[in-house]
Amino acid sequence: MAAKGGREKIKLESTAGTGHFYTTTKNKKTMPEKMAIMKFDPKARKHVTYKEIKLK
């Protein structure tokens, strides 16, 4: 049997305050810090910073 994956599901939420979010995974061993990525927010219709929050 294969070992369980070391990836954790996370939620990237828009800092524009629109409530839009993306979900993705990340490896906690190689990236222990929180992610912050510029992505397109379709509600704000521009690129904004998305910050990582815990996926419930």
Swiss-Prot record:
Transmembrane segments: none annotated. Gene3D superfamilies: Ribosomal protein L33 (2.20.28.120). The keyword Metal-binding does not apply. One of its GO terms (cellular component) is cytosolic large ribosomal subunit. InterPro entries: Ribosomal_bL33, Ribosomal_bL33_CS, Ribosomal_bL33_sf, Ribosomal_zn-bd. Signal peptide: none annotated. This is Large ribosomal subunit protein bL33. It comes from Delftia acidovorans (strain DSM 14801 / SPH-1). The lineage of its organism: Bacteria, Pseudomonadati, Pseudomonadota, Betaproteobacteria, Burkholderiales. The gene is rpmG.
